[in-house]
Regions:
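PLP-dependent amino-acid enzyme catalytic core
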Residues: 2-33, 38-453
Length: 453
């Protein structure tokens, strides 16, 4: 038997339709609930087919986002109180917009061929919600709260053609009834062509993001700051109020997303969800914001971060993270709190056959699908996982097994599943075989004829 509660409307709706429908009476009791004509919930039960019963909606009127009523705090703009150990940082964000589903779970990850007495745990930030937006949600909760506070009516951000951050930003903007403008970097031979609907592009275009393409050469020559400034100036001249989010959402405000995540991990450890403490934090580094937040948070919490960069080089990230930490008046040297190693392989979002084969093997062995953009690397406690990072870690475990013996490691799975859809041609030779099932024509049906199932 299958059961579902169906809420639907014959009209188009904007974010939080349930809240809008119930706003007039948040204490609606069960009797009123059954008799009020415009507010009905139907339980539909069927053995094989689920029927959908329509709920009549109130007349639709366009209004700006209103968060005066919400369920479980989702899509609400709340005052933010930092952890006590981070209260000296400055500036401290005043508000946080609840966009994700937190805390994300932690569970054991049974990776094959681990060194003796090595435990690996996985924190599932890939389950943070917002259309598989992974770790990007944490940064956007603070950035979007700031955009709303500044009265923005649209968002600008920039990244690669398969940027997880850009896709997450496009979704978050629509949650809040804001337009989104994306500047996406691609090859010079494709910059004048339709970018298609593969992976993140499909979601971005479904939610109505405005896409401007630039070549990698233009991006390198002009830079992300100037490109976003040019688009911002254009929109301001059109009477818009744009809010610019940098590459990866990585600035001193976005860093708070993973300062908050460290507090979340602390609380999960205190509740006994992991059965033990961890030794260090290991992350894959793409734009710097995540490792900066984890770095300052873990340093204040007495942990150390080991980061594996998937683009640029370690020195670049040390300097970039230092700028972010200085922006928070953290009073700490980036090289004292994080250990950055190179794991970019062919480069950001580029993979060798060996790396993709590894992603497939991990999925087959554990059921966990990794992002191919970031390499799987492991060192000590918390690893932000993606394909490239874990690959590097497992390789280091084979080459230096004594380094890992007895270690307790936490991987943070940062999401990015949609990036795999841009790798289908490379993945095709690596996935399992298929065949047509051999069925003899004379085999009779055992449960009669004319049934669908």
């Amino acid at each position: 038997m299958l059961s579902c509660i169906c809420l639907c409307s014959t009209r188009l709706f904007s974010p939080n339709p349930i809240a809008r429908a119930l706003k007039s009476n948040s204490k609606l009791n069960q009797t009123q609930h059954h008799h009020h004509h415009q507010q009905k919930i139907f339980l539909c039960t069927s053995r094989s087919n689920l029927s959908v019963t329509a709920m009549e909606a109130p007349p639709q009127t366009e209004q700006p986002y209103n968060n005066s009523f919400e369920f479980d705090g989702f899509l609400s703009n709340k005052p933010y109180n930092p952890p006590s150990w981070a209260s000296h940082l400055n500036p401290i964000p005043s508000h946080i917009f609840s966009l994700g589903h937190f805390p994300t779970p932690i569970h054991k990850w049974n990776l094959p061929n681990l060194p003796n007495n090595t435990q690996v745990w996985l924190k599932r930030d890939d389950l943070s919600g917002m259309q598989l937006s992974g770790n990007k949600v944490r940064k956007l909760e603070f950035l979007m709260a700031d955009a709303v506070a500044q009265g923005a009516d649209c968002i600008i951000t920039i990244g690669g053609i398969q940027s997880n951050h850009c896709r997450a930003t496009a979704v978050a903007a629509k949650y809040l009834n804001l337009d989104c403008y994306l500047i996406l970097r691609t090859s010079k031979v494709l910059v004048d062509k339709d970018p298609g609907l593969t992976g993140n592009l499909l979601v971005e275009r479904l939610v109505g993001a405005h896409i401007d393409l630039v070549s990698k050469e233009e991006y390198a020559k002009i830079g992300s700051l100037e490109l976003t400034s040019l688009l911002k100036e254009k929109l301001v001249n059109e009477g818009r109020k744009p809010y610019v989010i940098p590459v990866g959402g990585s600035n001193s405000l976005g860093v708070w997303g993973y300062i908050k995540a460290i507090k979340e991990i602390e609380q999960q450890l205190q509740s006994g969800n992991s059965e033990a403490g961890f030794d260090d934090i290991v992350v894959a580094c793409g734009s710097g914001g995540t490792i900066a937040g984890l770095g300052i948070g873990s340093w204040l919490s007495k942990l150390k971060v080991h980061a594996f960069c998937v683009c640029d080089d370690p020195d670049y990230f040390y300097e970039y993270v230092q700028d972010l930490l200085d922006g928070l008046q953290g009073g700490v040297n980036s090289r004292d709190i994080i250990d950055i190693q190179n794991a970019k392989g062919l480069g950001y979002a580029m993979n060798t056959t060996e790396e993709l084969k590894f992603v497939k093997e991990i999925a087959e062995a554990t059921g966990v699908v990794l992002d191919p953009v970031y390499r799987v690397v492991m060192t000590f406690l918390v690893v932000i996982t993606s394909g490239k990072a874990v690959y590097g870690l497992m390789k280091d475990m084979v080459e230096n097994p004594t380094k890992w013996e007895g270690r307790k490691i936490l991987f943070i799975h940062t999401g990015g599943l949609l990036g795999l859809f841009d790798k289908t041609d490379q993945m095709m030779p690596l996935v399992g075989n298929w065949r047509k099932m051999d069925i003899h024509e004379s085999i009779p049906r055992m449960d009669g004829t004319g049934k669908m199932f």
